[in-house]
Curated annotation (Swiss-Prot):
It comes from Methanococcus aeolicus (strain ATCC BAA-1280 / DSM 17508 / OCM 812 / Nankai-3). The gene is bioD. Pathway: Cofactor biosynthesis; biotin biosynthesis; biotin from 7,8-diaminononanoate: step 1/2. Mg(2+) binds at residues 14, 45, 106. It is an enzyme of class 6 (ligase). ATP binds at residues 10-15, 45, 106-109, 167-168. Belongs to the dethiobiotin synthetase family. This is ATP-dependent dethiobiotin synthetase BioD. GO terms for cellular component: cytosol.
Amino acid sequence: MIFITGTDTGVGKTFVSKIIGKHLKYKENINTGYLKPIESGGIEDTATLKEALNLDENLNILNPVNLKNPLSPNIAAEIENKPIDLVEIKKSFDLLKNKYDFLIIEGAGGVAVPIKYNSFLMSDLIVYLGAPAIIVSRPDLGTINHTLLTIEHLRNKGILVKGVIINCINELDTVLHYEKTFETINRCGNVEIIGIVKNENEYNINFDKIIG
């Protein structure tokens, strides 16, 4: 299993999860499942992966905590008077982990987004589920700081960081010296860049690193 997290919201976690899931299921014939423990702002991410991987579970199994408002989970849960139940998340996790040979778990927002007001963060959910992590990052200016902070935060929680996948939301040609940016993340973060995604059909990802 792998936990797909990111340096921020909107960085492309769902997009990258879809690419990884489709490759593992349809090109490597690995029985691959998906779990989105918490989704704020609708059910679109979960529905996208359910369709892409042709999963037969109901959406409430794939996404046990669904919040209507596109806000931090702790805020959305408070506004909607809907306490986040870790037991329900664990039930879905156990069911899916036992059914599938490989489970993709996708986070919401970044690693330090609060799930509860008691300082239970998204990174604590990763620890709770016992999963290693992959960080989805972007190539643009500012990404070095965001990526290195994310790596440090995860490692301080004892989470194994398997690598970073760069999701090119913008064309790489428009990013100045992106090779040096990637090299800086690699060297300063002591982490492998295991993938670069240009679009849904053009990507270079070390899938062995993900499943190994």
